[in-house]
């Protein structure tokens, strides 16, 4: 965490809005082949492994000129290590593949959106790992051909925490309403999420990268009382329109919107698709038509 704070401070106004939990520095250690692994806590040389990592990190902090006090964090960290030792630490890749061999169902849930992926997201405003579907393969140790259905879960509007490009962001009362009604605050930091209209360019890009087979839309009830609802279908850059997600999103990029009539009812009262108002169905079917993917839903008995 201290390294995370030091790196952010060194970037000044160019900071990326990290959660400050030390995720980036942890991945830096991993990629440089200096990182500690969970299995190390069981090693007889654990203290020496830790001491080497600590010395390396302190050298970086001195180079950045960052003042810090590690005592309290270090105490909590060693408490966490002792807690971790209580668990049965296994080679999980064998466990998962044995379950697959027994025809057991495994649900892998991603914690972050496609545009936070370190390779395919809005770099450098990304996390340090692969948040796309392929990340499940390297995260679990399974082959790509073992993946079955890929469910693309998205909100009926867009949100983002921290810095980074957001073409459909709303800076007005509408965006504030989305945030308030949708309780849009960061799960880790509690920061206000930036809110905006649904971006179909970004959604279609995410569908392509992940190989999505079914879409699941959530939080459409946040806009129950909206008079109109908009969807970005294309971007306009330099006077030309494109439906491709660009390598870099600059200030000259403008979203092109399609406006829909609001459904003006409480969707929570609907028990099946037939119960939905025509305005909401038009919104859903438009997204399906442009994304070429069906929006599915659980039954009320699921």
Predicted feature descriptions by range:
Residues 293-294, 301-302:
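Single conserved hydrophobic/aromatic residue that forms the stacking wall/gate
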Residues 194, 298-299:
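A subset of signal/propeptide-processing and intrinsically disordered low-complexity segments
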Residues 1-290:
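TRNA-recognition modules of translation machinery and tRNA-sensing kinases, especially anticodon-binding
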């Amino acid at each position: 965490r201290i390294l995370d704070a030091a790196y952010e401070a060194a970037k000044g106004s160019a900071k990326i809005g990290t959660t400050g939990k030390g995720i980036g520095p942890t991945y830096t250690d991993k990629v440089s082949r200096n990182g500690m692994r969970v299995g190390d806590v069981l090693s007889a040389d654990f203290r020496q492994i830790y001491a080497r990592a600590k010395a390396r990190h302190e050298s970086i902090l001195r180079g950045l000129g960052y003042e810090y006090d590690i005592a309290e964090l270090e105490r909590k960290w060693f408490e966490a290590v002792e807690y971790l030792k209580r668990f049965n630490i296994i080679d999980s890749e064998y466990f998962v593949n044995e379950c697959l061999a027994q025809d057991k169902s495994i649900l892998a849930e991603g914690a972050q959106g496609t545009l936070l992926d370190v390779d395919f997201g809005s770099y450098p405003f990304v996390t340090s790992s692969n948040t796309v579907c392929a990340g499940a393969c390297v995260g679990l140790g399974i082959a790509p051909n073992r993946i079955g259905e890929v469910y693309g879960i998205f909100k009926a509007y867009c949100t983002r925490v921290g810095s980074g490009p957001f073409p459909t962001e709303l800076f007005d009362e509408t965006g504030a309403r989305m945030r308030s009604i949708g309780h849009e605050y960061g799960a880790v930091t509690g920061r206000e999420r930036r809110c905006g209209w649904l971006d179909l360019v970004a959604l279609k890009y995410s569908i392509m990268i992940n190989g999505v087979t079914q879409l699941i839309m959530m939080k459409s009830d946040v806009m129950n009382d909206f008079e109109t609802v908009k969807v970005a279908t294309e971007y306009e850059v330099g006077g030309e329109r494109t439906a491709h997600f660009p390598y870099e999103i600059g200030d000259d990029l403008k979203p092109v919107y399609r406006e829909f009539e609001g459904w003006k009812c409480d969707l929570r009262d609907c028990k099946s698709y037939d119960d939905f108002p025509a305005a909401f169905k038009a919104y859903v079917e438009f997204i399906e038509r442009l994304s070429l993917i069906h929006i599915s839903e659980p039954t009320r008995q699921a």
